Amino acid sequence: SPDGKKIIFTSTRNGDLDLYTMNLDGSDVRQITTELGYDGGAWFSPDSKKIVWRASRPTTDEDVKVYKELYAQGLVMPTQMEVFVANADGSDAKQITRIGKANWAPNFTPDGKHIIFASNHEYERGFPFNLYLMKLDGNGVTKISHDGGFDAFPAFSPDGKKFIFSSNRNNGGTHATNLFICDWIL
């Protein structure tokens, strides 16, 4: 966490992929998600009071069956993921996207007022992935990258002035993924 007190992580220790927090020394481990499904990719807000993550939650009996069969093999099928926010202790959890496909790699903007995430929701074939910005309640989804490939894993410099993301743009057809850094001016 930005306040230097907690770590957030995904673990299978309870028989499902859930989020946990703990102190930096490994003490006070607490499970903070409990619904069946694949919870992961969590980040704390800049003030350490909120968390954001992506989850794939099976909803139908068939989805649950497939999820459990894959999980038993140590696999997941993260093709349908949505973005969630909660208090840092996991309370008041809310799904804030309902746009379908894979919405993942969410992170808070430096001011804590928006969430940036990767998604393929606009594309029939599930590709490309671009970056989108939205308010904390999921409203105002705005596309901020316009590449025909893969843009994901948004992050910010500690001072909030630089924006960093991974992309396979400009790779000469090699499928290499590189880091890109630019000024953040929101």
Label each residue range with its predicted role.
Residues 1-186:
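Sequence signature of WD/YWTD-type beta-propeller architectures
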